């Protein structure tokens, strides 16, 4: 026995030494060589486990804002083509339409807003004979015409009226943007009731016209100053502090009651996922006066494109605090826009943002900012735009941006009434950066290489959208289904069906968006 031990002890020692060395090398690779880890995670094959029994939020749909461009599209020779691309079944089939109640920058002779796309006609106009302001619903005619055309295609079931600023005659500085004292709202308290009456009167007009107006959003991005610099004076906007927000909502509730109007409030459309968003959501949700007239809570997911922890944190909070009212991500675009109009990079960011907002943030709907935007020429002489469509000044020429197809991967396959279900990956491909702040380690960047979300449709299909920011790899599925149809978008081909047959492992192309429909 002693001889055996004499032989075994050195052998075990050698094996332990080798094991420690290997583990040490592996540790060094994983924890010190970040580039190696990221490279491996961006090329590793993926297996998704999709569990239709783990259900989340029901989907109310997808949409875009008509702000800044519908009045241009409404007088363009390409009006019908643009409308069909966005709001018909042949196009994106969007069902949510955000109509901007303009603050009158196109009517105000003293405005500093010079861009004709950003100027708005108001329904509240000066009668030069009487010297009084009155309502004229023949105004904003081109934007109304475009809305009517989009409604005629039958996809829209939700119209949201939103205002970036009160009418310029109601503001402190007589402008549609904030005053120099950024911490003071440009809407004085004595005009809250007048502003509420103005909004609800306009809503009543659209409802009587037969437009399916569900919500009115009186406040938009109250976080920002909208006037301290000349940059902020280039578009309509208004700062509000917390008490301002709550009192404006109360004024709107009072007006809705008086008019006995079948409409609810949305908002307050925080411009980012930050601490104010939580404060505003919680107050509006729990206020006994406002709550019965609150139809949905709305926010914008700007400045979190690579801060997935913000989206996860919001989703966890909503799950705990907001139990019986819809939450909508009501505005996002690529900001600042660094992707070319025809680049897959813009589409990947668009799709990744949509997938993560839907998968992690516990929302019921997702709405893009501008459906159409102008074309900007960068310092490199190339064309940039954050719109789903991009065109020249009068939209006599336009093109479909690559990010349009990103939206199509969701809106054309996931109908209203679908329910989010659980999707798990077999790889940990997170990139995370932490910094020390006030003695604590704080996450400043967090993102995945492969992002995905799945829905169970009303007719029993499972739809999964996968966004691959990495290299070509294999993807396999564990799902209660027998057949699947697969559609991909890459730089070379958009919305191309690449497979139809039994559920199987397939190739996930590099830098691609993939929609899989399981049956």
Question: What residue spans do the PLM features occupy?
Answer:
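N-terminal type II signal-anchor transmembrane helix
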Residues: 4-35
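N-terminal catalytic cores of secreted or lumenal carbohydrate-active enzymes
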Residues: 41-214, 218, 236-241, 246, ...
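Conserved, mostly hydrophobic/aromatic
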Residues: 64, 93, 159, 216, ...
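Active-site neighborhood of glycoside hydrolase catalytic domains
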Residues: 194-212, 222-335
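Aromatic/acidic polysaccharide-binding cleft in carbohydrate-active enzymes
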Residues: 326-412, 421-432
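Carbohydrate-binding surface patches
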Residues: 427-482, 511
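Solvent-exposed beta-hairpin/edge-strand motifs
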Residues: 480-494
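C-terminal beta-strand-rich structural cap/linker in extracellular carbohydrate-active enzymes
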Residues: 499-519
């Amino acid at each position: 026995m002693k001889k055996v031990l004499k032989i075994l002890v050195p052998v075990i020692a050698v094996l332990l030494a080798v094991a420690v060395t290997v583990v040490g090398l592996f540790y060094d690779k994983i924890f010190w060589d970040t580039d190696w880890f990221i490279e491996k995670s961006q090329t590793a094959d993926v297996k998704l486990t999709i569990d239709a029994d783990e259900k989340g939020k029901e989907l109310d749909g997808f949409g875009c804002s008509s702000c800044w461009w519908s009045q241009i599209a409404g007088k363009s020779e390409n009006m019908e083509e643009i409308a069909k691309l966005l709001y018909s079944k042949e196009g994106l089939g969007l069902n949510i339409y955000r109509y901007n109640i303009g603050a009158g920058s196109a009517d105000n002779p003293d405005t500093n807003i010079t861009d004709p796309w950003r100027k708005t006609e108001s329904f509240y106009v000066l009668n030069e004979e009487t010297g009084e302001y009155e309502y004229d619903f023949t105004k904003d005619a081109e934007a109304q015409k475009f809305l009517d055309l989009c409604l005629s295609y039958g996809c829209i079931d939700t119209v949201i009226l939103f205002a970036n600023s009160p009418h310029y005659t109601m503001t402190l500085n007589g402008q549609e943007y904030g005053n120099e004292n950024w911490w003071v709202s440009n809407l004085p308290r004595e005009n809250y009731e007048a502003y509420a009456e103005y909004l609800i009167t306009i809503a009543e007009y659209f409802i009587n016209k037969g437009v399916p107006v569900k919500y009115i959003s009186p406040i938009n991005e109250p976080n920002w100053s909208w006037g301290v610099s000349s940059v902020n004076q280039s578009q309509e906007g208004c700062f509000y502090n917390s008490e301002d927000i709550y009192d404006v909502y109360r004024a709107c509730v009072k007006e809705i009651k008086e008019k006995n109007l079948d409409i609810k409030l949305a908002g307050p459309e925080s411009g980012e996922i930050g601490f104010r968003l939580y404060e505003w959501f919680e107050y509006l949700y729990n206020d006994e006066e406002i709550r019965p007239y609150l139809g949905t809570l709305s926010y914008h997911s700007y400045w979190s494109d690579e801060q997935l922890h913000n989206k996860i944190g919001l989703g966890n909070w909503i799950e705990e605090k907001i139990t019986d009212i819809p939450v909508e991500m009501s505005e996002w675009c690529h900001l600042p826009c660094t992707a070319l109009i025809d680049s897959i990079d813009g589409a990947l960011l668009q799709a990744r943002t949509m997938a993560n907002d839907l998968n992690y943030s516990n929302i019921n709907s997702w709405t893009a900012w501008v459906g159409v935007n102008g074309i900007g020429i960068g310092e490199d002489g190339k064309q940039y735009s954050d719109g789903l469509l991009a065109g020249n000044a009068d939209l006599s020429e336009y093109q479909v941006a690559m990010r349009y197809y990103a939206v199509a991967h969701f809106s054309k396959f996931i109908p209203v009434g679908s329910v989010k279900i659980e999707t798990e990956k077999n790889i940990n491909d997170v990139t995370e950066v932490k910094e020390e702040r006030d003695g604590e380690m704080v996450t400043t960047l967090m993102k995945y290489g492969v992002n995905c979300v799945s829905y169970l449709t009303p007719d029993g299909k499972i739809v999964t959208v996968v966004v691959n920011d990495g290299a070509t790899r294999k993807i396999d599925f564990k799902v209660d289904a027998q057949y699947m149809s697969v559609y991909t978008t890459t730089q070379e081909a958009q919305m191309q069906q690449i497979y139809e047959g039994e559920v199987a492992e397939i190739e996930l192309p590099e830098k691609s968006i993939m929609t899989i429909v399981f049956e």
